[in-house]
């Protein structure tokens, strides 16, 4: 097979609006209808919205690790806070040193700068081999160097506040939000309450909360000790550090509530540490999140195939795993450039492939145009759930209904069985019990048969077998040809020359002429003989009449 042509749409951010506008001009058709396909073993499992993105937006979170205690409670919390600070410094000092080495590597110009830059990266990696992702992270760290310096310039004002979250904008090139998860705890427990607590209880509460936060910090930075500055922080780690205050930054960066959960599940929101100051216990993290463009008229439809029964054995439909539909146009979608969530696809670019007319006709409901491959084995799961109902191949497995009791049989030639709550309430398949709540209405096609002409060979073993049969047929044909050649070799070539053939034809023509003349002569003689016989008979009858007349006289 040759390479298939594809439709490639590069996705720089400046083209997002143009693509969205172009697609919005196309009339939106209904989703791919799976009702006529289910009985043919092709199941539409769901749709997802298609989005394009580029990681272009950044913002900074300044995590205030050390909380400010109320003046009247500082003495009570002094001991646990000092222990917390010592542990915190021990845990995060490797991170700060790694960040500082990489940022200082750009102080030299020219080729030496490049060598120092790579050397700083390799010095931060345990095995001495820097991956492309780590070099990219280090480059981002260098770019954030000025922003980190600006944040450190404001560290006194950041550490002095008792607010759990507030914007830091003075002299910064990007949005920065100072958050303090521990400060939030202190405010909730001590600053914003009139309840009087004794010193022992304050010490215990602060100590327990600090230990819990240290555990979270260890969870975040523990796996990064080997290369602390070069590993991205996940959204979960960011929430562990910042608490619920993380939402404030995301909202400021333009992430809507309807999009937030989907983006969190995609893993596209990440963070990179850009500074750690042990004196003030400030941790700076640059957060990167995507700029997303939604293609309103484009959706991705997911297809699954079920092993069906045919007269040639079990087979599966040859259809794409994912197709995309815009208006009446359906093409195969390459999802290798996309990140999937439960409801969305986030793609850096959109790559589609045109489908053959047969597959296009098949997906539009013409099941007689669907092609099947005998590649599914007998151990393939012969059933699939769909919206509270079951599509099963009851020839491959026993479909036992527990309520009402009975065995569901599959008619001869029927590809699969559609089982819903009207035919069985509780279904048992291979020891798995399912309670059915859905139904297949009258719009679902049933009793579909797969013709022999629709089943083709695509598996490697089957193709090898077919090639073996073809080779045997060719060998037999060659044997027949050799036998024919041997017989032809015995023919006298002189007898088959041109002059001999002309002579044979001439003699044959003369023989035919003689034969025809002989036949005409024979017919003439027979006719003449019959005429003579008639004359003699007339003469005889006439003579006899005369003799009788003479006798009477």
Swiss-Prot record:
Free-text description of this protein's post-translational modifications in UniProt: The inactive precursor F0 is glycosylated and proteolytically cleaved into F1 and F2 to be functionally active. The cleavage is mediated by cellular proteases during the transport and maturation of the polypeptide.
InterPro entries assigned: Fusion_F0_Paramyxovir (IPR000776)
SUPFAM superfamilies listed in its UniProt record: Head and neck region of the ectodomain of NDV fusion glycoprotein, Virus ectodomain
Membrane topology note: Single-pass type I membrane protein; Single-pass membrane protein
Signal peptide: 1-31
Coiled coil: 142-170, 466-491
This protein's record includes keyword rRNA-binding: no
Membrane side Cytoplasmic: residue ranges: 522-553
Major location category of this protein: virion
Keywords: Cleavage on pair of basic residues, Coiled coil, Disulfide bond, Fusion of virus membrane with host cell membrane, Fusion of virus membrane with host membrane, Glycoprotein, Host cell membrane, Host membrane, Lipoprotein, Membrane, Palmitate, Signal, Transmembrane, Transmembrane helix, Viral envelope protein, Viral penetration into host cytoplasm, Virion, Virus entry into host cell
Lipid-acceptor residues (S-palmitoyl cysteine): 523
Cellular component annotations (GO), alphabetically ordered: host cell plasma membrane; membrane; viral envelope; virion membrane
GO biological process, one term: fusion of virus membrane with host plasma membrane
Region of interest (Fusion peptide), ranges: 117-141
Site annotation Cleavage: residues: 116-117
Localization (cell): Virion membrane; Host cell membrane
Pfam family, one: Fusion_gly
Spans traversing the lipid bilayer: 501-521
Its job: Class I viral fusion protein. Under the current model, the protein has at least 3 conformational states: pre-fusion native state, pre-hairpin intermediate state, and post-fusion hairpin state. During viral and plasma cell membrane fusion, the heptad repeat (HR) regions assume a trimer-of-hairpins structure, positioning the fusion peptide in close proximity to the C-terminal region of the ectodomain. The formation of this structure appears to drive apposition and subsequent fusion of viral and plasma cell membranes.
Protein name: Fusion glycoprotein F0
Species, as recorded: Newcastle disease virus (strain Chicken/Australia-Victoria/32)
